[in-house]
């Protein structure tokens, strides 16, 4: 019930050897609640477009208004966040073992902090270990992950990027780090994750052994 797949790039080291962990937020540490199709309809964004990329290409006034709507929508969701299966236990176990932990989200830092507070992890991550879309170019850009590599003074392969979507995997691979996919049972992106496990609870079990 735990193992799904382990790709060849992970063979050189076990998950338990990883001491530097960067987590996506929404859908990884929390139960996914964003209705991206609805957001795109509300903001008149084509369904096939990425929201942040689309907004970045708009005239300043229009982009500002739409970012304000998006922020208000995200704020309401953040306050009501629920932890994903095993997420709190995994983060607490890694914290207890002295691992370095970071958050890399396409949301904004202040709302990531609201979310962490809502799911009971508000005391774990220092402000500088929470990187949102205003601190670094958003995923799939590797910029945010490269920030953590430099901040922690570690080689890229010593860091694992944990997420539930292809942008997390693309970010990790572009930065030269390990990649761990959770909460995506069918794995629509084969070959991109070093590890593919059911959820954070399964990650904790694998990490312990």
What is each of the regions a protein language model found here?
Residues 51-53, 76-77, 133-134:
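A short acidic, glycine-rich active-site loop
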Residues 31, 103-105, 181:
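Hydrophobic residues in well-ordered beta-strands that form the structural core
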């Amino acid at each position: 019930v735990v193992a799904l797949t382990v790709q060849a790039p992970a063979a050189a080291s076990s998950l338990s050897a990883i001491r530097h962990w960067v987590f996506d937020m929404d859908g990884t540490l929390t139960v996914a609640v964003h209705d991206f199709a609805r957001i795109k309809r509300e903001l008149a964004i084509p369904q096939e477009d990425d929201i942040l990329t689309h907004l970045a290409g708009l005239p300043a006034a229009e982009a500002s208004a739409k970012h304000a709507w998006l922020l208000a929508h995200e704020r309401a969701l953040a306050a009501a966040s629920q932890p994903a299966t095993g997420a709190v236990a995994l983060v607490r176990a890694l914290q207890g073992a002295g691992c370095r932990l970071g958050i890399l989200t396409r949301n904004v830092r202040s709302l990531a902090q609201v979310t962490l507070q809502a799911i009971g992890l508000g005391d774990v991550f220092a402000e500088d270990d929470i990187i949102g879309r205003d601190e670094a170019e958003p995923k799939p850009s590797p910029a945010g992950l490269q920030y953590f590599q430099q901040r922690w003074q570690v080689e890229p392969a010593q860091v694992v990027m944990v997420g539930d979507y292809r942008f997390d995997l693309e970010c990790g691979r572009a930065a030269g780090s390990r990649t761990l996919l959770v909460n995506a049972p069918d794995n629509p992106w084969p070959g991109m994750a070093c590890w593919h496990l059911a959820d954070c609870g399964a990650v904790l079990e694998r990490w312990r052994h």
